[in-house]
């Protein structure tokens, strides 16, 4: 009976797909890649979003290969996003590191500020805080929105990815839609 279960598990595992780390929809990298696509620097298929971080990294690599077509501002943006997607570049290019890299409240190997970052050749973890405040008015009444939380993502080998985005939202004011 156990042999049958093991055989069934192995047979069905061929239909399993690797886990993907998607880039959250509110990130500005989507606008940047869309602009480059409109200029025909790259082809960015983003009709279905979110897209994976690895796909975005591939498009950033394509854009860097055509950097002569970019403005100075676009080159700066490309450099910024390239730092954020360094881990994905390393996975795509199969780059191995000599030892584990740990960053606590500082800049990681990609020169990005992170609360915590860990990476070795088999496992990576990035943890960043989320904090925001927005104040405004609606119908001449004060309205505030405060949010905080954590965003983490990483990879186990190059086949399994994971991400978690937790946010606590607090809205105050007399014009809040409490039914939403």
Tell what function each PLM region has:
Residues 132-134, 169-173:
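Structural signature of outer-membrane beta-barrel domains
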Residues 25-32, 83-144, 154, 158-164, ...:
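Transmembrane beta-strand segments of Gram-negative outer membrane beta-barrel proteins
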Residues 16-20:
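Boundary at the C-terminal end of the N-terminal hydrophobic targeting segment
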Residues 39-79:
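N-terminal, post-signal-peptide region of Sec/Tat-exported proteins
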Residues 5-15:
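Sec-dependent N-terminal signal peptides
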Residues 174-178:
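Outer-membrane beta-barrel and related beta-rich outer-membrane complex signature
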Residues 1-3:
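N-terminal secretory signal peptides that target proteins for export/translocation
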């Amino acid at each position: 009976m156990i042999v049958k279960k093991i055989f069934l598990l192995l047979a069905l595992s061929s239909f399993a797909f690797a886990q993907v780390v998607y880039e959250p929809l509110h990130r500005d990298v989507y606008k940047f890649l869309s602009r480059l696509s409109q200029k025909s620097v790259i082809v960015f298929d983003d009709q279905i979003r979110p897209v994976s971080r690895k796909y975005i990294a591939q498009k950033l690599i394509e854009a860097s290969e055509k950097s002569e077509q970019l403005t100075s501002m676009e080159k700066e943006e490309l450099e910024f996003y390239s730092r954020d997607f360094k881990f994905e570049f390393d996975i795509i290019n199969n780059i191995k590191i000599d030892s584990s890299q740990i960053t606590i409240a500082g800049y990681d190997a990609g020169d990005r500020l992170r609360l915590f970052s860990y990476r070795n050749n088999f496992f990576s973890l990035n943890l960043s805080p989320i904090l925001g405040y927005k104040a405004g008015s609606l119908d001449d009444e004060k309205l505030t929105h405060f949010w905080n939380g954590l965003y983490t993502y990483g990879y186990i080998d190059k086949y399994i990815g994971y991400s978690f985005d937790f946010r606590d939202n607090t809205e105050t004011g007399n014009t809040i839609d409490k039914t939403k």
